[in-house]
Amino acid sequence: MTLIRATTPCPSPAWARLQRALIDRMNDCAVAFVDRYTREDGSLIWRDTWPGMDGSDDGYESFGSFPLFYALGGSETVHDLSRKQWNAVTKQFTAYGQVYREYDAYYDWMHHGESNLYLYGFGMADPNVAIDRERALRFAAMYIGEDDEAQNWDAEHRLIRSPINGSRGPRLNMTAEDWCTHRDVLANYLTPYEDVPGIDAISDPMAIADWNDDETFAEILKRMNQRMARGDVPLNLTATSLVTHAYIHTGDEKYKRWVLDYLDAWRERTEANGGITPDNVGPTGKIGECMDGKWWGGYYGWRWPHGAFSILEPLLIAGANAQLLTGDGSHLDLLVSQIDILWNLGRTEDGEFVTPNRHGDAGWFAYGRPVSSYIVHLNALRGNADDAAQLARYAALGPWSRDISFFKLTQSPPEPWQAFNEGSDPDYPERAMQRSLEEVEGRMDQIARDDGDPAEWDVHHWQNLNPVLTGTLVQLTMGAPSIIYHGGLCHAPIRHFDPAQQRPGLPEDVAALVSDVRPESIVLELVNVGSSKRTVQTQAGAFAEHVFTSIERLDDDVGPLPDCSASRTVLFEIDGGCSVRVRLGMRRYANRPTYARPGEGPQS
């Protein structure tokens, strides 16, 4: 075991004190939040009925940050609550009708991806819970052709048979009731079809169709069943996380083969379409089969509702998963090719470089500033010379945003983290912890003043108030830009364990800061803000997929450095009031990924 000791007292930096205050505060707030909004059995204090296919994801999102927070260093109480609440949400939305066999009956993979973050967090929290492993395998079976009741996978054509899918299988014909609780939301977006009667999408491609008008909605639903219900879309690539999750639990090669084959199928479709990823293929795998031959216009595709986002994000998620499984970064090239296409279509408007975000019958439209988050993630995941060039290309457009927001619970904007990692924003750690604390307190203040009628609350009510925010903690303690919220796994260069308590996460009183993240190394600072000695075991890779290759001491507490070549973990003993700062060399993707804790998992 590679051991580093820190024995020289030093003042604790502000970021470290704030980090520990944030963790301690969220431990308390999680309990108060659950007490305020749930019954004794954990069910949400809400309405008795909830129709339609939307909403279970929002129930899970209301507590979905809890297991990840525990894995970062949250309390055992939060861990216990995370499991109670998952079971309660599952039972409640089963009664409503959205969940079947403990999984969403049918919906799209943007929403599956959001709710599945809860499941992926359980793997990091405790890999030895038998029901977690059983669910991982059972849910993956629904997508790889091993579940007779959920025939989502077409092995012959290498496609998921519908954009709307789940534990009941593909939803090949949608009903008005399926959409009844989501029409208000979609009424704010551009029309999904350019030939809806009464909509002039030719002169105004962003024209809105009123989903709340019954006649208009009937026309939309008819076209949706004709054009979008059958066949595959890139959004379904997010299912690779669920199958990779099963692989991390088991190491079974069938899961790996499925992920790689499915991503390859979309790569081949892209090549067949002249280099642009089509946003739809029909039941036989033909591009535009249900869309009058058009490669655009599919469900969550290049046109509707979000545009390029719904193509690029699944390609990022699937490429990252494939790299995790193989160590081969070329699986992210498909993402890069689409980013390059959009960049090359860019133009200057009012002195600013803009790229298209959507494609319709009239071509590309909805130009705006290029989205930089994908490139930050790409560079953190792979970090080769081409990725560095991509990063520089975006950076040339202007400084990285330093805005710290909390749109989703496990996500924080990656651009401020990138500025810090490059060295241009050294105050980011302190500011990130301070802003996180302020956001937690702001949410607790909202909760204290929340005296409305629960029967009237929106289905997003609780997730918008959940005070357990993990985004900045992932950035600072694990050295990753964030988790891709709509279904990404927690790809990161390191994670920590508490060997004294035999649990994941930072020990009590210990704060961590990862900086200068490079493909071959990171800088790690650990601070013990308390008075008692603490021991931290730091693992190479969130899933033990990396190995450490060297240690360089960067502080004044020098001493003989042990050889850590090919080590999965490094042990730090830190006296009270002391800290340690090291550069850890690493070789990435040297091991099979596993949820197993240090000493428990496979060694290759």
Predicted features, each with a name:
Residues 1-559, 564-604:
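Glycan-recognition and catalytic cores of secretory/periplasmic carbohydrate-active enzymes
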